[in-house]
Amino acid sequence: AKERAHKVLNLVGLDESYLERSPFELSGGQKRRVAIAGILAMEPDILVLDEPTAGLDPQGAKEMLELFKKFQESGKTVIMVSHDMNHVLKYCDHVVVMNHGEVERYCGVDELFSERDYLESMSIDLPVITDFIQELNMGGFHINPSIKDIDELVNAIGGEYNG
């Protein structure tokens, strides 16, 4: 159990000293990381996360989301509740849109974000990169709307400009 604790602490970006610390000494972000480490130490097949990046700085949020993505890529199931559509675009495969406690829609991420009018009707913001790509395409570019990464977008714009 101790070996597993060391392993998961490292995965969430904390050193072994956290095994001996009082929870009252930890910041909000550290408490969240310790809680996630405790869950991962149980080696669950399904991980349900409710706003998992709340209280984390941008770098810490990215690290946690990358960790959850690796967990999912290892064959495990990750269910994430999030209002951050930038995170949904980059880290999710499927989306369930809830409306007044009811399932409004279930679909793939690319399908959801291709329907600007529907999103506006539901007061859901487009991810920044998706919004930018749609604006470019309305202006005459032909950029793949399923791009999720800024480097890939830069290359696509360069290809359009040079092509």
Regions found by a protein language model. Give the residues of each.
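A short, surface-exposed alpha-helical micro-motif characterized by mixed small hydrophobic
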Residues: 88-90
